[in-house]
């Protein structure tokens, strides 16, 4: 059993429409790669470790956490085995998006049958390049079990003058010290909202 305090992991991106067989353009960016199509929707998946982010992703889990790698059909994800404090934070450059289009940011998660300790609401936050913050709380304990569920962090529209900024998104539960287990985070999707 390994106990870790803080971890930075490198991840890669995969375009949503890749699953639908559209042709893709891939761009290498440091440790990851970015794949684009016309509608500019992005889905983020980790290469090897727990959670998800674009190129660098920070996970901070109070004093200790333990996770197990879990293979899904299309990507490797991780299941939380023992978590006290949850802090998942990511950033994304908005220059890759289409100006004046409405986008949504969603976390893709699954709660397994044996999940415990999710009695406190989890905070989902989105910070825009303008500094505007969108925040919502979700009781993940009420999610349907053993099914991938999308939890929205927020919606946004990028104006041409803020095109070269960043959005930040996070999933936090830092108010309780209750040990939690059984949550699998598959990824974060940033995609056009129809």
Swiss-Prot record:
Superkingdom, taxonomy of origin: Eukaryota
Keyword Transmembrane helix listed: yes
Main location: membrane
Membrane association type: Single-pass membrane protein
A GO term from the CC aspect: membrane
Keyword Ribosomal protein: no
Subcellular location as annotated: Membrane
Cited Pfam families: PP2
Transmembrane segment boundaries: 49-71
GO terms of molecular function: carbohydrate binding
Tissues expressed in: Vascular tissues, specifically in phloem companion cell-sieve element complexes.
Matches recorded under InterPro entries: PP2-like, PP2-like/Lectin
Keywords assigned by UniProt, alphabetized: Membrane, Transmembrane, Transmembrane helix
Name of the featured protein: Protein PHLOEM PROTEIN 2-LIKE A2
Organism expressing this protein natively: Arabidopsis thaliana (Mouse-ear cress)
Lineage: Eukaryota, Viridiplantae, Streptophyta, Embryophyta, Tracheophyta
Gene: PP2A2
């Amino acid at each position: 059993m390994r106990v870790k305090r803080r971890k930075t992991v490198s991840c890669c991106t995969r375009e949503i429409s890749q699953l639908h067989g559209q042709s893709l353009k891939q761009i290498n960016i440091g440790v990851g790669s970015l794949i684009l199509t016309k509608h500019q929707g992005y889905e983020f998946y980790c290469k090897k470790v727990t959670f998800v982010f674009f190129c660098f992703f920070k996970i901070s889990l109070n004093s200790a956490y333990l996770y197990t790698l879990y293979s899904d059909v299309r990507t490797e994800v991780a299941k939380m085995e023992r978590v006290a404090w949850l802090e998942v934070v990511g950033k994304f450059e908005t220059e890759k998006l289409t100006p004046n289009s409405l986008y949504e940011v969603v976390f893709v998660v699954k709660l397994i049958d044996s999940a415990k300790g999710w009695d406190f609401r989890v905070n989902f936050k989105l910070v825009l390049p303008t500094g505007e913050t969108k925040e919502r709380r979700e009781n993940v304990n009420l999610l349907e079990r053993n099914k991938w569920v999308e939890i929205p962090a927020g919606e946004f529209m990028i104006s041409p003058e803020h095109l070269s900024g960043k959005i930040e998104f996070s999933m936090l539960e830092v108010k309780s010290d209750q040990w939690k287990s059984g949550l699998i985070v598959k990824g974060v999707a940033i995609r056009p909202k129809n």
